[in-house]
Amino acid sequence: MPLEQRSQHCKPEEGLEARGEALGLVGAQAPATEEQQTASSSSTLVEVTLGEVPAADSPSPPHSPQGASSFSTTINYTLWRQSDEGSSNQEEEGPRMFPDLESEFQAAISRKMVELVHFLLLKYRAREPVTKAEMLESVLRNCQDFFPVIFSKASEYLQLVFGIEVVEVVPISHLYILVTCLGLSYDGLLGDNQVMPKTGLLIIVLAIIAIEGDCAPEEKIWEELSMLEVFEGREDSVFAHPRKLLMQDLVQENYLEYRQVPGSDPACYEFLWGPRALIETSYVKVLHHTLKIGGEPHISYPPLHERALREGEE
């Protein structure tokens, strides 16, 4: 199914699966060199795709250029896989008009969206505002007609994966700033080697705790995160060392509490909201945000609303 259709059909219970796909999406494509950007800018959207997107029967995904930085080695495989799945679905549904061209076009939209995500992440790290004109000039030249859908998808993925929101501050000139979602002041970019914002994972964990009822067993946290292919003992291309991030960094930053379950033998541990999280945001904000960008997989839709409404009344 094409990327746009996937988003349109996303249900609340598919939230973490959607995040998992997004995590694979935003880590597999190296940023283009100046020469590549110039060549891309002088071509139309479909023309760019014809030389870049593999055929439906291609045995392997495209590879990133050698020497790609760790900042952007996460995007090609998922795009290739989604394109391949789209081709398979088309075959099952029967012949359609120009299926190869349609697949290439959808892949081109996805590829441009990914380029824009990387561009906006660089702007966020530099703490610089960005205009629509700058996005068109730097990333989407000759793609003006497709700007609304590409920009919308890029904004959605920034929220979904990184917890970064694109906010329009001057509508007349289409000037935007990039800020962390929900008023959280942590993004995990304190060290020189920290290249990916970590706010998205923090929001996911806070949501899991809120849904579980003020505290969540450690195994429940890792069970949910495994749906994003984020595992306790495995280094992650976006979140680096997830175990250290949750059990040390976010605890030290007072966003999470990690404690032994009282009376447990053998010892079991659980996560709670830390004091900094309680000051900067709230259960209702986190739960509404979770519903807005895709929902939660295992807890049914109504209870999520009920909990948010209860807190709103309190």
From Swiss-Prot:
Location within or outside the cell: Nucleus; Nucleus, PML body
Gene3D superfamilies for the chain: MAGE homology domain, winged helix WH1 motif, MAGE homology domain, winged helix WH2 motif
Chain intervals with Low complexity compositional bias: 21-44
A biological process from GO: cellular senescence
Domain named MAGE: residues: 109-308
UniProt KW Transcription regulation keyword: yes
Tissue-specificity statement: Expressed in many tumors of several types, such as melanoma, head and neck squamous cell carcinoma, lung carcinoma and breast carcinoma, but not in normal tissues except for testes.
Record-listed Phosphoserine modification sites: 64
Domain of life: Eukaryota
Region annotated Disordered, chain positions: 1-69
GO terms, molecular function: DNA-binding transcription factor binding; histone deacetylase binding; ubiquitin protein ligase binding
Pfam entry (one): MAGE_N
Keywords assigned: Nucleus, Phosphoprotein, Transcription, Transcription regulation, Tumor antigen, Ubl conjugation pathway
Basic and acidic residues compositional bias, start-end: 1-20
Role, per record: Reduces p53/TP53 transactivation function through recruitment of HDAC3 to p53/TP53 transcription sites. Also represses p73/TP73 activity. Proposed to enhance ubiquitin ligase activity of RING-type zinc finger-containing E3 ubiquitin-protein ligases. In vitro enhances ubiquitin ligase activity of TRIM28 and stimulates p53/TP53 ubiquitination by TRIM28 potentially in presence of Ubl-conjugating enzyme UBE2H. Proposed to act through recruitment and/or stabilization of the Ubl-conjugating enzyme (E2) at the E3:substrate complex.
PANTHER family: MELANOMA-ASSOCIATED ANTIGEN 2, MELANOMA-ASSOCIATED ANTIGEN MAGE ANTIGEN
Subunit structure of this chain's protein: Interacts with TRIM28 and UBE2H. Interacts with HDAC3. Interacts with PML (isoform PML-1, isoform PML-2, isoform PML-3, isoform PML-4 and isoform PML-5).
Protein name: Melanoma-associated antigen 2
The species this protein was found in: Homo sapiens
